[in-house]
Amino acid sequence: MMWWFLLIGLASAAATASSASSASFESRCQHFHKEIHLQNVHVLSTTYVPIGSNIPMVYNPPICGGTASSSISTIQFCQVALNVTTSDKSQFFMEAWLPSNYTGRFLSTGNGGLNGCVSYADMVYATQYGFATIGTNNGHFGDTGQYFLNNPEVIEDFAYRALHTGTVVGKALTKLFYPQGYKNSYYLGCSTGGRQGWKSIQRFPDDFDGVVAGAPAINFVNLCSWGSRFLKITGPPGSETFVTSAQWSAVHNEILRQCDALDGAVDGIIEDTDLCQPVFETLLCNSTAVDKTSCLTGVQANTVNEVFSAMYGLDGKWLYPRMQPGSELAASFIYYSGNGFKYSDDWYKYVVYNDSNWGHSTWTLADAAAAAAQDPFQISSFDGNISGFQKAGGKVLHYHGLEDAIITSDSSKAYYKHVADTMGLSPSELDHFYRLFPISGMGHCSPGTGAASIGQGSSTYAGDDPQDNVLMAIVQWVEKGIAPEYVRGSKMSRDGTIDYRRKHCKYPKRNRYVGPGKYTDENAWKCV
């Protein structure tokens, strides 16, 4: 059942122009383009999308999935496609979806990686809840940094401008389409989308009343350097420093052996990675070992230790935290494969050095220093002073998976502490507007081994109750003043049913198994 406060206004919706009969709504949509006269905005189309039809994706290029990204609409809405000019050398594409079941709420989605691609899945998810929803391509199409080459205007769009300008345009369209305008504005994004959410909080604190920021790529420039650093640590396949995927599996099993029970339950999930400080000398191969796929040489053990160590600059200053243990199975194919990391490579090629011939094999800490000094348009998004957002009455729900193999969850904890130190606030004082939830058993923005479906998107839907759904939780916090004390995640089975649930604690508290039920019993855990 849809949470009751989401239905405010729907009882009288039939009396409004936005949700009258299908025929009148269709006519309203088809003629809407005649009302749009916004500076630097070019309307490409306005399309009526009825219930049960394929959602048109005519402007989605093949590099972003093309028409294959389409899905069936569960509601009727008006799909508005536009190009927005940001300079004489740059523009971004955006869509606004204006539903007939409008609840008076506006929402912007974010992006991922270095793209370049409208988050249609998130738009579908938000629009079905009655949000007037927008998404942009963040200044370029495609999941590559090549469009940044020789074009700082495109970099500026990617850093902050496309999201902010798209939000301004989207709000204007919402006011034009619905006589009642909007009551509250929200943001939903993960990874790069998480960084965009934080950048908005830091630079444009009035843009959103509520922000859901997952696994944010904050401290972005150093994150790119961190991604480059792993090749320097592991070396190429076949080198004495390289650790094979089979050996990483042995490392993972050893990490679980040392750390799984620290939370009181042996369930294959690490609840608090801060407590996990594994020692890898236990995996050293002895002189008689025949099968060396499950043990490490001394050199390889040093490689593993370096992987799980923080990155420091040439001057000895901290740049980026360690990779949290528990992510190594997936990370061995992403960062530890000996082939470099595409997004890091692209950032250095097309932004730092503006040289498409730059090679990742030459990377050193001197390059990290050059990148950090550049930080175009403050894309790092690591400003610890978010007092503007606090004063504006904004609320932010920040989550991060503890099995994230792309952006270490230690980065989110580091930022939380940075905000606390910068603003001189205790956790209880931060609670009024900023709450962080580390999610055990969650990978990068998506489920992993544990109860990690928290309603951050259609693929992780586990109910409409705010305790099970971070989007509904931020709405309840903004509109009812009821802040989430925990986020309840669901472990989904292959048939879509729920195997078990677990409540994920608000940082800096940690989850502890206290019994007496099984570890699958959510009431057998306590935040301490």
Swiss-Prot record:
Top-level enzyme category: hydrolase
Binding site residues for Ca(2+): D260, D263, A265, D267, I269
Function: Involved in degradation of plant cell walls. Hydrolyzes the feruloyl-arabinose ester bond in arabinoxylans as well as the feruloyl-galactose and feruloyl-arabinose ester bonds in pectin.
Domain of life (superkingdom): Eukaryota
Gene3D superfamilies (alphabetical): alpha/beta hydrolase
GO molecular function, one term: carboxylic ester hydrolase activity
Keywords, ordered alphabetically: Calcium, Carbohydrate metabolism, Disulfide bond, Glycoprotein, Hydrolase, Metal-binding, Polysaccharide degradation, Secreted, Serine esterase, Signal, Xylan degradation
Keyword Metal-binding appears in the UniProt entry: yes
Family annotation (Pfam families): Tannase (PF07519)
Source organism of this protein record: Aspergillus fumigatus (strain ATCC MYA-4609 / CBS 101355 / FGSC A1100 / Af293) (Neosartorya fumigata)
GO biological process: xylan catabolic process
Family designation: Belongs to the tannase family.
Location in the cell: Secreted
Gene responsible for this protein: faeB-1
Record's protein name: Probable feruloyl esterase B-1
Signal peptide: 1-19
